[in-house]
Amino acid sequence: VSARFPGERIVVPAGRLKVRSNDTDYRFRAHSAFAHLTGLGVDHEPDAVLVLEPTDPGAGDDGTDHTATLYFRPLAGRDTEQFYADSRSGEFWIGPRPTLAGLAARTGLRTAGLEELESAITKNVAADGTAVRLLAETDQDVDALLAAVRTEAGVDLAAAAEADAQTAEFLSELRLVKDAWEVERMRASVAATIAGFEDVVRALPRAVGHDRGERVVEGAFFARARLEGNDLGYDTIAASGNNATILHWIRNTGAVRPGELLLLDAGVEDDSLYTADITRTLPVSGTFTDVQRRIYQAVLDAADAAFAIVRPGIRFRELHAEAMRVLVDRLDGWGLLPVSAEVALSDEGQHHRRWMPHGTSHHLGLDVHDCAQAKRELYLDGVLEPGMVFTIEPGLYFKEEDLAVPEDYRGIGVRIEDDILVTEDGAENLSAVLPRTPDEIEAWMARLQA
């Protein structure tokens, strides 16, 4: 960050507590850029702001051009009103808080109280003074403070807004390649997620026949996420029957019926805030019907084809193209396409998108859709590098009202999703130990439910 923005002040807020209802807040979760730069996870630290102050070249931290200071609200003494009366930050209400020295020791950063933040952000701001770059729309108070100072100082507001957008873009791009520690945390997230899938299989008999069986599934996975991680990485999709044809079905209010398929898309967020993102489609009764197996195998073949080409040097977009070639071939073989496979795969065709409308892959890390602000040429058109982690998740979705497919296909949705690490000479499927083939899934479910 220092090398990218020499001579400029960089302001990265963690964010504020968000109200769920009246005086009840959501559990705090810091902005991913803040977590990435500070190494803080779990619920650290509401209202905190990381400020990188420019220095003379080489005079900053570790020979960089900036010094970094973490501003936050530290432990309040028992002789303060805050300790007893502040339900958001008082230790009597929420438990112990870190001291300035404690968080400095933990992060290796300078620390200071929030009372010093305004001066740190606003000093020397002028049209010809210190330029400030802000991770905007993260903390409304910081946004308002800097907007007022920029206006008063005569700073070009359009140029400042563009600089802020570039900063968010760059901070997102920083996460495209994971280091060894990040990969280790993602392995832990994947392991906890796999344990959660096993919990769901054990809970399936209890879900069957319940009016809200999908909630039984959701609850079983959530318990594991809170037991082994910080939280869910995203709202669990527990979609049975026709609900599996709804890409982001998170109401999970449906029943789970014998003979249906259950699409479970879920991930545990580690205490470090790195998350897994895995999907399996399971036969509720423990065995696939012939048509379910046929559709599932087509999706599995597409996923395997995409994985087979993963290696450094190929472009990210090639994964989707490879998976689509397989799915289009299967759809054509089933007689579902109104045109040839060649026409369907053309830019003008895309007829298969009726049944597979989403992308095959997305980056994964601190956000389930990580690096989302990265430039197109580094993401979709980007070249794969060792250390990148992303999903491969093709699917087929045949809605129950879709008269363009045979009746026995209707109401079936299948998605298979794994978390993939690019290595020096290929790739590793981080979630490969979770059964993937129809036979493996049937045997796995039988063993867990025995």
Model-derived features with residue positions:
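Active-site neighborhoods and metal-handling regions in enzymes and metal-associated proteins
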Residues: 1-450
